[in-house]
From Swiss-Prot, chain A:
Signal sequence coordinates: none
Keywords per UniProt: Cell membrane, Electron transport, Heme, Iron, Membrane, Metal-binding, Transmembrane, Transmembrane helix, Transport
Family to which the UniProt record says this protein belongs: Belongs to the HupC/HyaC/HydC family.
Compartments, record wording: Cell membrane
Pfam families to which the protein is assigned, alphabetical: Ni_hydr_CYTB
Primary location recorded for the protein, binned into one broad class: membrane
Entry superkingdom: Bacteria
Function: Probable b-type cytochrome.
Name used for this protein in its record: Probable Ni/Fe-hydrogenase B-type cytochrome subunit
Annotated TM spans: 31-51, 75-95, 142-163, 196-213
Lipid bilayer topology: Multi-pass membrane protein
Keyword Iron on entry: yes
Swiss-Prot record, chain B:
Protein name: Uptake hydrogenase small subunit
Main location group: membrane
GO biological process: anaerobic respiration
UniProt membrane topology term: Peripheral membrane protein
Highest rank taxon of the organism: Bacteria
Assembly, per entry: Heterodimer of a large and a small subunit.
Amino-acid positions noted as binding [4Fe-4S] cluster 2 in the UniProt annotation, renumbered to this chain: 232, 235, 260, 266
Keywords, ordered alphabetically: 3Fe-4S, 4Fe-4S, Cell membrane, Iron, Iron-sulfur, Membrane, Metal-binding, Oxidoreductase, Signal
MF-aspect GO terms: 3 iron, 4 sulfur cluster binding; 4 iron, 4 sulfur cluster binding; electron transfer activity; ferredoxin hydrogenase activity; hydrogenase (acceptor) activity; metal ion binding
Family membership noted in the UniProt record: Belongs to the [NiFe]/[NiFeSe] hydrogenase small subunit family.
Record: residues binding [4Fe-4S] cluster 1: 62, 65, 160, 194
């Protein structure tokens, strides 16, 4: 779906500025994005406080359940993230072709590498004008895969392996993910990697938010509003 | 001797009454988590089955497993199990020494070929052809391979035999390895711990002798009945964990009130063992009850995970050691600084180029 509309500037005598808009992100995908964003925030904060708990609660144990609530929020958000991710994989099959960009990085295409290089130069301030992209730019696509897809899968697998320890032997989580613990060595090693994974995703979120804001301002297409409304707007009508 | 002695014969010969014997069977059934109906079955098995000899080898170790084992708290286990299990060879506990001891080992191996159980305490060092541990003038690794050849099953006592323990800790100069790296063709039951709990040891061995099969094992080869849950899952201080009440310092109010030791490095949440249920010394206490966190002695490589008083593993880098949070925070800080710098340059460039924008 694409839309072309002409906007007259001011009194309309100097030039007609065209803005082309393309419908990129469908509603389920946008919903998934913001639900995942929220669950990552919840997971990061609660996860940190599981590893380094808040100061001791006063009073009797029976009157407090702070760690219980924090852990509940962590596990609930973990379920939301993991199930949402499965839904996202499903959407890659049934959604539009932009929905597949997250999972299928076209590393076999020479042109893609060329554009990747162009994008690297753009971020190093060596290119004056960026290229236009309907979906992700190559660098963004690669980063989304390496940081988000790999990171989320890693955190889900190690997370459910740790969750299985609480559910107990022969629980569904233990049958599905219990093999992860001996793979890493022992439980404490999985905890350590899960911690490192959190920081990996923290770095991802920082870079992701910064670049989304930055591109929204200096690139030639809309970024943030696209993930809200689904339409990619272009700021000029020069080619590519 | 036309027929081989049964356990019951041996126990009666040791002066144990039938009443005591039946009490022992009930206690064993209870200890193994079996119903009352199993007590007569255990009694029957012990009356009819020829006893299985156990050959107990000692490799590179500190003998803490033996020390724990001989303190088994069941009233009768101390008297019975030692005679009952027909410990035909254990160079620490047996009366014979030297050539007689080695002769007893060879005789049992010959007479009970494929029937005896091999229990290994400690582990073999592989470096320098195994010369870091010499038993009877020969490297322990040779004795281990020799005895394991005709064994029915193998028990790995303690963290040494199961995982490697302190002698296999970095940098492991003797190249000590857990026994499953050497014995690859026999079923191995791992009973980790440094040492394992006495009742766990006697429980495992009694199960194997009475039922003639291995107990149900988990993925890492540990009996599920004793290593199925973490210390944390059955810890009596768990309500304080859920409430968010922690010992922050060793001398604070929380320590006096018996709050959770999570923040002072308790490894209970990552350690599979029976300490919080079976406890130690006739069920008297266990480390957490004594006010000190679990150090995770039954877990693989527990010596190499950094401080016993930190929850997070120490990650060695180029000479400095940090934990996951310190590394993560440093990286996040670096990336944050990079983002700020990049944003600043972006803003400057944008101002510079303002004139020639379309």
């Amino acid at each position: 779906m694409a839309l072309e509309k002409s906007l007259e500037t001011g009194d309309g005598q100097e030039k007609v500025r065209k803005q082309t808009a393309v419908y990129v992100y469908e509603a389920p995908l946008r919903l998934w994005h913001w639900v995942t964003a929220l669950s990552i925030v919840v997971l990061g904060v609660t996860g940190y406080f599981i590893g380094a708990p808040l100061p001791t609660m006063p009073g009797e144990a029976m009157d407090n359940y702070l760690m219980g609530y924090i852990r509940f929020a962590h596990f609930a958000a973990g379920y939301v993230l993991a199930i949402g991710f499965l839904g996202r994989v499903y959407w890659a099959f049934v959604g539009n072709h932009h929905a597949r960009e997250l999972f299928l990085v076209p590393v076999h295409r020479k042109a893609w590498w060329k554009e990747l290089w162009h994008e690297v130069r753009w971020y190093l301030f060596l290119e004056k004008t960026p290229k236009k992209y309907i979906g992700h730019n190559p660098l963004g696509q690669l980063a989304m895969f390496c940081f988000f897809v790999v990171g989320a899968v890693f955190m889900s697998v190690t997370g459910f392996a740790l969750y299985a320890e609480g559910l107990g032997r022969d629980s569904w989580a233990d049958r599905l993910f219990g093999w992860v613990i001996p793979l890493f060595g022992q439980s404490q090693d999985v905890h350590t990697w899960h911690h490192l994974g959190m920081w990996y995703l923290v770095v991802f979120v920082m870079v992701h938010v910064y670049l989304a804001v930055r591109e929204d301002i200096v690139s030639r297409q809309s970024l943030i509003s696209t993930m809200v409304g689904g339409w990619r707007m272009f700021k000029d009508d020069r080619p590519d | 001797m036309s027929r081989l002695e049964t356990f019951y014969d041996v126990m009666r010969r040791q002066g144990i009454t039938r009443r005591s014997f039946l009490k022992y069977c009930s206690l064993t059934a209870a200890a193994l988590g079996l119903g009352p109906a199993f007590a007569p079955r255990i009694a029957h098995a012990m009356e009819t089955k020829p006893r299985t000899p156990v050959l107990w080898l000692h490799g590179l170790e500190c003998t803490c497993c033996s020390e724990s084992f001989i303190r088994s708290a069941h009233p009768l286990v101390k008297d019975v199990v030692l005679s009952m299990i027909s410990l035909d060879y254990d160079d620490t506990l047996m009366a014979a020494a030297g050539h007689q001891a080695e002769a007893a080992l060879e005789e049992t191996m010959r007479k009970y070929k494929g029937e005896y159980i091999l229990a290994v305490e400690g582990n073999p060092p592989l470096n320098e052809d195994g010369m870091f541990c010499i038993v009877g003038g020969k490297p322990f690794i040779e004795q281990l391979r020799h005895v394991a050849k005709d064994a029915k099953a193998v028990i790995a006592w303690g963290s040494c035999a199961s995982w490697g323990c302190v002698q296999a800790a970095r940098p492991n100069p003797t190249q000590a390895v857990p026994i499953h790296k050497v014995i690859t063709d026999k079923p191995i039951v791992k009973v980790p711990g440094c040492p394992p709990i006495a009742e766990v040891m006697t429980g495992v061995i009694t199960y194997m002798l009475t039922f003639g099969k291995l107990p149900e094992l988990d993925r890492q080869g540990r009996p599920k009945m004793f290593y199925g849950q973490r210390i944390h899952d059955k810890c009596y201080r768990r309500p304080h964990f859920d409430a968010g009440q922690f010992v922050e310092h060793w001398d604070d109010e929380g320590a006096r009130k018996g709050y959770c030791l999570y923040k002072v490095g308790c490894k209970g949440p990552t350690s599979y063992n029976a300490c919080s249920t079976v406890r130690w010394n006739e069920g008297t206490s266990f480390p957490i009850q004594a006010g000190h966190g679990c150090i995770g002695c039954s877990e693989d490589g527990f010596w190499d995970k950094g401080s016993f008083y930190e929850r997070l593993t120490t990650i060695p880098q180029f000479g400095i050691e940090k934990n996951a949070d310190e590394i993560g925070a440093a990286v996040a800080g670096g990336v944050g600084a990079a983002i700020a710098a990049h944003a600043a340059v972006t803003a400057i460039k944008r101002l510079q180029n303002k004139g020639d924008r379309p």
